Amino acid sequence: AIILLAVYRPNLLKITPNQWKIVIPSGLSLGAMNLIFYLAIERIPIGLAVTLEFIGPLVVAVIGSKRLIDYLWVLLAAIGIVLIAPWSNNGIDLLGVLFALLAGALWAAYIVLGTKVSKIMKGGDAVATGMLFASILIVPFGILENGLTNLTPTFLYLGIALALLSSAIPFTLEMKALAQLPARTFSILMSVEPAAASIFAFIFLQEYLTFNEILAVVFVVIASVGSTIT
């Protein structure tokens, strides 16, 4: 939030009541989504958490669909999600699953609200203001968890890098995308996330892809490309 506010410098005094009514819930849904997702990956594998979370955007895609061809891309994305999820793990933490599904519901809310915000506010202003309210929601939990004991130079450097790579840059780009794309198309394009999570897990964590996981990557890529060209 600090980085985005410094870069875009939104004039909070000029934000209208109608804009506040949308940007505040958008920011809160964003903050809650991130907080609950991290609670999920404390309990279940990242690939499963991302897969379950994507059910939210997938629901948005289905609800916003009006053509038969749209359901084909949603179906392909759904098949990819099912294939990529480690359903064979019998020791899955049910609370972790619940957290991931709740994060998905909040993600769906963020997509819908973000689409509305992008139509009435500049992208940078919307992201910076929304992230401000997201931080207002999340920071108290961090303070209650460990106080200020973790505020070492190394921790702060890593925190800044994480803030840029996981929030500031991605959500700025997402807001620009939401301004140009229907919520349905945006939701299907986001289906690359489960595939990306598995690929990065393979690269950085040496988690090898099975045949089903490779097939899942193919399905979600086809769904993403198909949704943009039809």
Cite the ranges covered by each PLM segment.
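C-terminal-most transmembrane helix of multi-pass membrane proteins
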Residues: F155, S191-T230
